[in-house]
């Protein structure tokens, strides 16, 4: 029976070739489409994980309810011990504290008076720990336009859009005007170590990145963090595991 069908297909190529080509093309397109969608989805999830959520996130219940207001008075305390516990409970993930805050960036003139001012969305991330992978996660070596990665707690990276708005460049000094985790008024000086462009449109328009030690110093948050983010060791998001 099989031999009979094979002979029929060979003798009448018009009935065998075109259906075979149609099947091959269809299967190829389906495989390509699935691969493309999985890649695009993982890229989207990775972008979201970097900027806001991690693959998993630990916050206080109170902070979660008011997270859009960046309520650092509801932050996590004793984060070092929390991260130690999480690392033992979930060894497939690595954990990093983050301080998320907003305020105004003030640029003084030669007389110390305000020359330029703009709102800022700032993230205090762990640049300096021995096992930190933040530079890798943010791909800063790829997106850094000018300057260098922060080397001290007073160094800051700002987006090229924000640098243009404030008319500042690498080496300039800016003053953060904001509030501490106890809602007290605070000012803190940062030195612009570099500028970056994440190519994420409005998401990084007013963004500033500093080391978490500088953020804690500026906001009086010793040992505290707005949130603790967890990333899978492979940096690939797995919804079932999360």
Locate the predicted segments by residue:
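A short beta-strand structural signal in non-transmembrane regions
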Residues: 56, 162-163, 224-242
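Short, conserved active-site loops that position catalytic residues or coordinate cofactors/metal ions
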Residues: 23, 54, 59-63
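Alpha-helical transmembrane segments
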Residues: 28-58
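A structural signal for hydrophobic secondary-structure junctions
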Residues: 61, 65-66, 71-209, 213-223
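N-terminal Sec/SRP start-transfer signal
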Residues: 1-31, 35
